[in-house]
Amino acid sequence: TYLSSMREDMKRAIEQGQNFRARYTDNITVSMMVRQAIYFLPEAIRNLEKEQPGVQVTPLFQYDNGVESFLKDESDVLFALIEQTKHIPGINVHKLFDSGIYLIVDKNDPLAKKNLITDEDIYGRTLMVGGGSPNALRSVQQKLISSGKIEYFNSPDHDSTLVNVASGKGICLAPGFLNDHSGQFAWIPYDSRECFHCVLCTHKTDSRESLAAFIQTLQKLYKDAVAFPL
């Protein structure tokens, strides 16, 4: 309910305040849809604490309303796709990385042995679609559906999709930034020019040195991750 949600928010705010008074002089809140979206965040936090002792980085996981929350000044940094940031005034947009499209299958699926997936590999299979897919992914899904050579059904979100993959109900195309690299599933690159331009947004009114250092730390980690699948 709304009331219980408000109580949880207040409890979290009190706990954060206690943490802040105890150890930190500055706090940077980062809104993202899921934990794995910024895979190098833990390493960035470690590096930042060495360079800027006393700066705390607090992740906020907001699958649906991250943009709205950011615009209400409820977070300092927003992980987003570039398409989400157009026509938003008063923000700075910092390029982070480009992410490709991957096919997610069970590790025992014959397709798991392939190095690259084409449309022909997916024909005859059952594909999960929907779940708030970004524009680049929706266009690929629609192309496959229009071929008439696949079965498909809607999945409400990424976690539901993974459960369905694990239970053998279907396979799925997804952005690489959703990969948690746990090794539970096979993620195989899909042959497409479509990609997702992942960025970090900050408020133009926020000119803290610690914030600039945090953004630069993350950008460097992704720039140096040459062989890491994104």
Region spans (language model):
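Secondary-structure junction motif
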Residues: 40, 119, 123-148, 211, ...
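Central regulatory/effector-binding core of bacterial HTH transcription factors
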Residues: 25-85
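Extended ligand-binding regions for polar small-molecule ligands
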Residues: 120-123, 197, 201-230
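Beta-alpha-beta core module
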Residues: 88-94, 99-100, 160-209
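Hydrophobic hinge/microswitch elements
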Residues: 63-67, 71-74, 81, 132-187
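Short coil/turn segments
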Residues: 32-38, 82-84, 101, 106-116, ...
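Acidic, Gly/Pro-rich loop/turn segments at junctions of secondary structure
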Residues: 51, 63-124, 177-182
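Alpha-helical "hinge/linker" immediately C-terminal to small N-terminal DNA-binding modules
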Residues: 1-22
